[in-house]
């Protein structure tokens, strides 16, 4: 587990995208990613504008949106990202052969590689998935892009553990500048081999412990103390009548305090 500051890690990181994100986190004093699973662009943009000051990342599932368009959704989302200084993570969870994911990432309705700073993928199809996604990024944009591998999940009964997780880590080692880290519940090592992977952890809640569909929640301090760099929070920010402004500030403070404690044990 890294006890170095985000600022120090940014200065040495092999990935331009990871370096940009770490420096942004340092400057804004936040390690909060807002996961916004809503079904209209209006609601997405409303929540993003409220939560923007408190977050380093917004995590989207644009295939949920009933009214997605490049001009109506992506353009204003990128404007809000510039206004509030956060990056965009499209939680696509690619899981196919290299050539197919290359097309899924760059083409179709969503053209993800053109606007999402970060996306993610399962390791189940092998290292070709990394190569395909990287080629798509290089062919469609001059902007830096980053990929997270799904090493562990927060849902009850997940099969992503043990040998599967180890295999996913080995796939991540095939590309040092494009693969920036993992979706995981704990530190994934790698520092002794020269990797500085970012760990982003879903299923974080200050109050909730679980939901009816198998999601299991851990506390902010618990996930940061076991190696997470970024906490991913969804319904804890805006569900059940919660005020996103108040909750955004609460989670930002909790995440930052836990990070400072890890850096200064």
Curated annotation (Swiss-Prot):
Domain of life: Eukaryota
UniProt xrefs under CDD domains: OMP_decarboxylase_like
Pathway given in the UniProt record: Pyrimidine metabolism; UMP biosynthesis via de novo pathway; UMP from orotate: step 2/2
EC assignment: 4.1.1.23
Listed GO biological process terms: 'de novo' pyrimidine nucleobase biosynthetic process; 'de novo' UMP biosynthetic process
InterPro entries for the chain: Aldolase_TIM, OMPdecase, OMPdecase_AS, OMPdeCOase_dom, RibuloseP-bd_barrel
Keywords: Decarboxylase, Lyase, Pyrimidine biosynthesis
Binding-site list for substrate: 37, 59-61, 91-100, 217, 235
Annotated catalysed reactions: orotidine 5'-phosphate + H(+) = UMP + CO2
GO molecular function: orotidine-5'-phosphate decarboxylase activity
Annotated active site: 93 (proton donor)
Any single Gene Ontology cellular-component annotation: cytosol
Keyword Hydrolase: no
Coiled-coil segments on the chain, per record: none
Top-level EC class as recorded in UniProt: lyase
Family: Belongs to the OMP decarboxylase family.
Protein name: Orotidine 5'-phosphate decarboxylase
Organism listed in the record: Zygosaccharomyces bailii
